[in-house]
Design a protein with these regions (language model features):
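Conserved beta-strand elements of the Class I
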Residues: 13-17
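N-terminal carbohydrate-binding/catalytic regions of secreted carbohydrate-active enzymes
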Residues: 49-60
Length: 200
């Protein structure tokens, strides 16, 4: 009689596609510290010129081909986007395109440094002076200085992740009646990756 082997259920996996090095570093630290209940894979694909939309679809096809577990787990693919270099029309088009291909768009307005700043304070001012504000808490922080930035960023994430989630939720509540992404300033949707609930 053959021995029955009970397969352990596969752990869900998130693929995180991002534009820049700061985002890539951030989520590599999240992975290292095991702050998500799922496996995560991070890939930096650079800023996407939206006159060449096939690029991200190609990345998605490569993921589907290389990661067969995606079809067997409750896994998701996310694209982390800075909103400050796009028009509202481009953002709306991006969102439709990505969601049609089962990619969840998580944007920050104006950019990802807002996400980092929210670990340190509740910030509600319009503009994009996030690095200046971060440096009030962490004077040696720079936008991207390799290992030195990583050490500071790891400390911020390790000790202040709950604050970042709470502060981002407050911004969402503040802007709940606005439909335009660019009108929501400042705003970030990235915190939703830390929730098990459906991402809309």
């Amino acid at each position: 009689m053959k021995k029955i082997i009970n397969k352990r259920p596969l752990k869900p996996k998130y693929w995180i596609l991002c534009e820049g090095e700061t985002e890539e570093c951030y989520f590599s630290i999240v992975k290292e510290l095991k702050l998500l209940w799922v496996q995560i894979q991070i890939k930096k694909i650079g800023q996407l010129p939206w006159n060449n939309k096939k690029r991200i679809m190609w990345e998605k096809k490569k993921i589907d081909y290389s990661d067969k577990e995606l079809k067997e787990t409750a896994s998701k693919v996310f694209f982390i986007l800075d909103a400050d270099v796009y028009s509202q029309q481009e953002i709306d088009e991006q969102r439709r395109l990505l969601e049609t291909n089962n990619i969840h768009l998580l944007y920050s307005n104006k950019n990802f440094e807002l996400r980092i700043l929210l670990h340190l304070e509740q910030y509600t001012k319009e503009g994009d002076n996030y690095i200046r504000e971060i440096k009030k808490h962490k004077p040696n922080y720079e936008k991207w200085k390799s290992s030195s930035t990583r050490v500071i960023l790891k400390d911020i994430i390790q000790h202040n992740l709950k604050d970042a989630i709470s502060n981002a939720k407050k911004l969402e509540e503040k802007h709940k009646n606005l439909n335009s992404i660019l009108a929501k300033n400042p705003y970030t949707w990235v915190y939703k990756i830390f929730y098990k609930e459906k991402i809309n």
